[in-house]
Each structure stands twice: as structure tokens, then as C-alpha cells.
Amino acid sequence: METQGKVITCKAAVAWGAGEPLVMEDVKVDPPQRLEVRIRILFTSICHTDLSAWKGENEAQRAYPRILGHEAAGIVESVGEGVEEMMAGDHVLPIFTGECGDCRVCKRDGANLCERFRVDPMKKVMVTDGKTRFFTSKDNKPIYHFLNTSTFSEYTVIDSACVLKVDPLFPLEKISLLSCGVSTGVGAAWNVADIQPASTVAIFGLGAVGLAVAEGARARGASKIIGIDINPDKFQLGREAGISEFINPKESDKAVHERVMEITEGGVEYSFECAGSIEALREAFLSTNSGVGVTVMLGVHASPQLLPIHPMELFQGRSITASVFGGFKPKTQLPFFITQCLQGLLNLDLFISHQLPFHDINEAMQLLHQGKALRCLLHL
């Protein structure tokens, strides 16, 4: 390609401050260095993690200017030295948590947080040299990276350990959803909780991740799936995802866990906290059966808080854990999951509520912020 080895100037949506509208502007994108890949992003969507970072909810994670975004799909523009599994023109998914294949975590079954390329909201530069690949076009000042990916840009540079090559016949606009939210939810149901047939499930928060948990639970043969959300507009999509019972905490005269106990006659086997709320996490824990209950935390929490659980409560037979990317190893396990989805295991169309051009990204952010969107797919 003519651009190979050269700096590319392209459009990016840059965050300049907490809660400020993203600025669509020209940025410079350096060529990929050793073991890096430069990607032309074709589709990206907005996740609540992007929204949290944009709002600057956790002060320790604030870094500006910054290019957010991590759920996307695109085509390789060029590769750096040492990259052998990909080449220009390949279709790829950026993955916010990588897999080097060599560390003790990557070599261990059941673990997916690579020691070198695991997701780190504090990290704002490339792993290889501690520098950025983005610069302002006017004064050449550095622009920081986000979650290993920074997909709110027409071009981005990513470590090859965080890039998954996919079949060019796969529809990129659909499988882009599998680079974060859908995989996170379904994987939590399968890989982390390991939902068993005929079991009961409660899901707190019915955004994209929560609905993906429901899809995963239904695929595993759960007998009853309960959805909890303060926005009743989400209940219809919940039904389509397999949820049979709904609780709106604002309309209940009892605590949510008390209602769940009544519905299930003793609590669910599995609960999932997908709301990023410490109160929801507490209710999710108390909603599980005393003896076999498992709670999986998936929501992004705004600031560090202690778990709302007394240590002695864990002696009641309940357990609690958390999950990143649904426990999937992104490069070795995700390809089979993508194939399963495209063969009809999940309805990926369910998750795309809006489609907008890239320059309308601030409108997309507001739709998600107001609870009016599930996934807004941006076309670059």
C-alpha cells in the first residue's frame, strides 16, 4: 500500500476532557512498530466502558487528550516487523485484552488475562516502547491510547497480540460486537459460571452485556431467567433474549432479592451483576441460593469501593467472582465462538439498536448515556 511505512493523517473522535463532547479532528497515526498492526477501522460501537471513561468517573483513569473505543472491526493496512500471522488486507477484530501465547496465564487453561497485554484502563501508551502512536495534526502533541485499541479513529495501531484475524467472508459489522459486549456476556454464562441445564438465573442490568448473558443462559438450557432493570423499555428485548420474568426495582415494594427468592422458591443458582452498581451487586449476591449460588460481576464500577459482603456470608455456600471478556482467550478460543454465532446460536441483530455515521458519534454517546441504545454501530 502507498501508506505503508508512512504517517497517516485521518479523522478521529478525540476526548479532550471529562464529559466534554468528543472532537472530530485530523490526527496523525504513526506506522506500526515491531509486532504491531495498523488497522483501518470500518465499524465501531460504544460500550459502557467507553462511556465511563468519557465521563471520567474514575479519576485515576483520566488521561487527555485520548482516543477511546474498543469494540470494532476493520482491515489491516500494514504490519510491523515480526508480525507473521497477519498481512495487509486481512479482516480483523481488535481485542482490548490480548493473548501473547507465551506467559504463564496464556498457557493455563481457564485463565485469559495475559500478563503482558491484559486490559488495563490506566495504560495510555503502547507496551513495546511506552510511547503513543497518535499525534495532533496541528502541533504534533501526543494523544493517548485506550484499552489497547483506540477504535474511535479511522486508523489505529495495536499490538498484534490484541488483534484477531477473521474469515473475510464473515460480516464485519456483526462480528464487531464480539470484540467486547456479546462475548463478555455469553462467555460469563458459559466459561465462568458454567450454567447447567434446567438451572435458574438472575441478571441485574439489561444492557448489551446483560442480554448477552441471557442469550448464553438460554443456549445452556436454563429453566428460568429473571431480568432486573429500572428501565422497563428494555423488557421486550429481554423477552427476545430468553428472559421470562422481570423485576423493576422502582416498582417493587420489596427488595429485589426477596422477589427473586419468591419467584424461585429459594434463590437462583446463578446471578450476574451487569449494572456497575454496588447496590445491584449486593442484591445479586443475596438473590442466589444459599448452598449453591454463584454471582458473577461484569459491571464497570465508577470508583474503588469495598465489596458489600461480610466474609461470614461466604460460609453460607454462596460464592462471588468477576469476569473480563467472558473468560475467553481472544486468539485461541474466540474464533470458534464467532463461528457458532454466525451459524445461528445467537441473534446478533438483536444487539444493534442504531446505526450512524462516524461523525455522529456524540449523538451515539448520548443515546447510550440516556439508556435509549443497546449498541449504536458507527460506520467509518
Curated annotation (Swiss-Prot):
- Assigned EC number: 1.1.1.1
Spell out the InterPro entries in the cross-references.
ADH-like_C, ADH-like_N, ADH_Zn_CS, GroES-like_sf, NAD(P)-bd_dom_sf
UniProt cross-references to Gene3D superfamilies, sorted A to Z: Medium-chain alcohol dehydrogenases, catalytic domain, NAD(P)-binding Rossmann-like Domain
**Where is an alcohol annotated to bind?**
49, 70
The keyword NAD appears for this protein? yes
User: Which keywords appear in this protein's UniProt record, sorted alphabetically?
Assistant: Cytoplasm, Metal-binding, NAD, Oxidoreductase, Zinc
Q: Where are the transmembrane segments?
A: none
What quaternary structure, including any partners, is listed in this protein's UniProt entry? Answer: Homodimer.
Q: Does the keyword Glycosyltransferase apply?
A: no
Where along the chain is Zn(2+) 1 bound? Answer: 47, 49, 70, 180
Q: Where in the cell is it found?
A: Cytoplasm
Protein's name according to its UniProt entry: Alcohol dehydrogenase-like 4
> Could you give a GO molecular-function term held by this entry?
zinc ion binding
Biological source species: Arabidopsis thaliana
